[in-house]
Amino acid sequence: MTVYHFVGIKGTGMSPLAQILHDTGYQVQGSDIEKQIFTQAALEKRNIPIYPFSADNIKPGLTVIAGNAFPDSHPEIAKALAEGIPVIRYHKFLAEYMKKYTSVAVTGAHGKTSTTGLLAHVMQQAKPTSFLIGDGTGRGNESSEYFVFEACEYRRHFLSYQPDYAIMTNIDFDHPDYFANIDDVFDAFQNMALQVNKGIIACGDDEYLPKIHANVPVVYYGTGEENDFQARNIVKNTEGTTFDVFVRNTFYDTFYIPAYGHHNVLNSLAVIALCHYEEIDVNMIKLGLESFGGVKRRFNEKVIGSQVLIDDYAHHPTEIKVTIEAARQKYPEREIIAVFQPHTFTRTQSFLDEFAESLSAADRVYLCDIFGSARENVGKLTITDLQEKIANAELIEENDTSVLKAHEGAVLIFMGAGDIQKYMRAYENVIA
């Protein structure tokens, strides 16, 4: 049997795919940078070998699965190609692998990871389900009927897939280094819709998704009356959220989620709609929703002394807005502090005013230096350009986070898609 070698095994898609193959009996190994990344814990738990990048890793008998971030000139990929060792790109391999299951793609500008995690958790209550979540979590089950996976629109990667179902959470302008404008983003989702084989579950409250055309049924969810699945009588409190679901204006059931913010009602509705479509028992759905513990880097809380520290992946103005709203729902009496690290110069430049507006919903804002991606690293913009647009915003350094101690009893939300976690760890060390 071949050994699958992952070039870039710590990637947020690559790591869960390696976990899935391992769980279903394949021999797996991989290589990556030596820096500790949150996606590697699950690999280490399974004793999957992780090597530093080196052409010496490439040997006969391997099948190389190459991460999208690495060109054919990468030493390992180049050697494999030169020696006739099979090389398959991540999305091509995944597209072929999922064909043996009923596949569900979860896509959208925001909410992909949380919705994928929730759907996988709920479906597992009823049927064996394999899943690939963009927080680095994957699980394979040889007897699975379903394969639930996160599908990203960036560089139109999701057009590699032809899933049975697709959940579309929303369409928004992001990834300005690739997409020209919102119409370009819509075009990508429209093309994706035409590749779905059985049905699409889409948010009808979204500005753009109702304009999608497809060759399969499109079921809409949301709070608007025109939706097929509608949430009514939404009650939000410090313990979570309760709401009634009506299916085409007929009462279906009442649901409770231990989650906060309107976006989590919509994510739950998407899951309820798909499970209803697949005739999964409503009690199984309710059990799954009520017992879901969340996904990595999405509103992950830690209480230290009088403060609540929250780690969140929010890196777009829309995501920052809903994360702060969720914190206010759960902690209405507390001061909300935003500690934000912008991710990529292009995104920061494109949404400078929107970032300022979203962050201003917090009671106080602290800003970290811009995290440049591997694709750019430098830009003319600096963090002070954002600071100047936010009243009383302060800059914060990893080696000097002690200023946060002044906010006794506050909720501190550390937000970003880069290495914002190192700032949170640094602060934890200060107050330990």
Swiss-Prot record:
GO terms for cellular component: cytoplasm. It holds the Pfam family Mur_ligase_C. Keywords: ATP-binding, Cell cycle, Cell division, Cell shape, Cell wall biogenesis/degradation, Cytoplasm, Ligase, Nucleotide-binding, Peptidoglycan synthesis. The keyword Ligase applies. One of its GO terms (molecular function) is UDP-N-acetylmuramate-L-alanine ligase activity. Its main location: cytoplasm. Pathway: Cell wall biogenesis; peptidoglycan biosynthesis. GO terms for biological process: cell division; cell wall organization; peptidoglycan biosynthetic process; regulation of cell shape. ATP binds at residues 108-114. It catalyses: UDP-N-acetyl-alpha-D-muramate + L-alanine + ATP = UDP-N-acetyl-alpha-D-muramoyl-L-alanine + ADP + phosphate + H(+). It is an enzyme of class 6 (ligase). Its EC number is 6.3.2.8. PANTHER family: UDP-N-ACETYLMURAMATE--L-ALANINE LIGASE, UDP-N-ACETYLMURAMATE--L-ALANINE LIGASE-RELATED. Belongs to the MurCDEF family. HAMAP family: MurC. This is UDP-N-acetylmuramate--L-alanine ligase. The gene is murC.
